[in-house]
Amino acid sequence: MVAITAAMVGELRAKTDAPMMECKKALTEADGDMARAEEILRVKLGSKAGKAASRVTAEGIVAASINSTTGALLEVNCETDFVSKNDDFLAFANDCVKLVAEKNPADVAALLALPLNGQTVDEVRSALIGKIGENIMPRHFKRFAGSNKLVSYLHGTRIGVVVEFEGDDTAAKDVAMHIAAMKPVALSMADVPAEAIAVERSVAVQKAAESGKPPEIVEKMVEGSIQKYLKEVSLLNQTFVKNDKQTVEQMLKAANTTIKGFTMFVVGEGIEKRQDDFAAEVAAQVAAASKATA
């Protein structure tokens, strides 16, 4: 049997970018044959990627790419916060958002089919899953192209905002930061979704009914609650986060700036995170190990 040296492991890792232990196992299985070890790794890492693909991805990052009036905002998910800080994962997300801005794919499937570094995006993704050991997937994106100016703001890597505007760049950047902090659901009161208003109205009606007031007073209480809600969730009517003496609309008017629209992505929003029972997980791993050695 051929002795597996550190140099051999290092050479295989340089060729495949696979973890050290995986390289050593592959070389041992291949009895030192480098080409055979590469083939073994391709099979193993592909299998690893397939197993990971069914796992929940509720962590990740939001990436942005802006160039004057063209740009994109993209969320890429992984399983843990630790991997969301991995350099290879970050590079993959940034490569993907640039492709969205440049190539204008119709959807995530089209993005995965685009070429990237001599492979498709999906092939790069699968190799990254094999290397890192977690499921990774672009979740959604939005591309921007038109006559409006664009500005982006990333709060760390978990919240991303793109604002479409006309006017002053600094004012627009301030608005992007405000959006990340205050999370409005619409530009103006008229833009708030009807279903959101219906939910708020239902809650307001129940609360007002419990007051025991006459019907006409109850109706006024409900309408007052709705108007308060609309002001709180519409960007232009919110109190500006950097100056509580004025609304966002007043700040923009003073800066001669108009917001045409905005998009905000928050990592994992709407995804139900998997809740693991750690003790049960450890017990299952111990049982599996015992079975394997039995």
Swiss-Prot record:
UniProt main location, coarse: cytoplasm
Gene Ontology MF terms: translation elongation factor activity
Listed SUPFAM superfamilies: Elongation factor Ts (EF-Ts), dimerisation domain, UBA-like
Keywords (A to Z) from UniProt: Cytoplasm, Elongation factor, Protein biosynthesis
InterPro entries, sorted: EF-Ts_dimer_sf (IPR036402), Transl_elong_EFTs/EF1B (IPR001816), Transl_elong_EFTs/EF1B_dimer (IPR014039), Transl_elong_Ts_CS (IPR018101), UBA-like_sf (IPR009060)
Subcellular location: Cytoplasm
Segments for region (Involved in Mg(2+) ion dislocation from EF-Tu): 80-83
GO cellular component: cytoplasm
Superkingdom of origin: Bacteria
Protein family (similarity comment): Belongs to the EF-Ts family.
Cited function: Associates with the EF-Tu.GDP complex and induces the exchange of GDP to GTP. It remains bound to the aminoacyl-tRNA.EF-Tu.GTP complex up to the GTP hydrolysis stage on the ribosome.
PANTHER family xref list: ELONGATION FACTOR TS, ELONGATION FACTOR TS, MITOCHONDRIAL
Entry protein name: Elongation factor Ts
Source organism of this protein record: Polynucleobacter necessarius subsp. necessarius (strain STIR1)
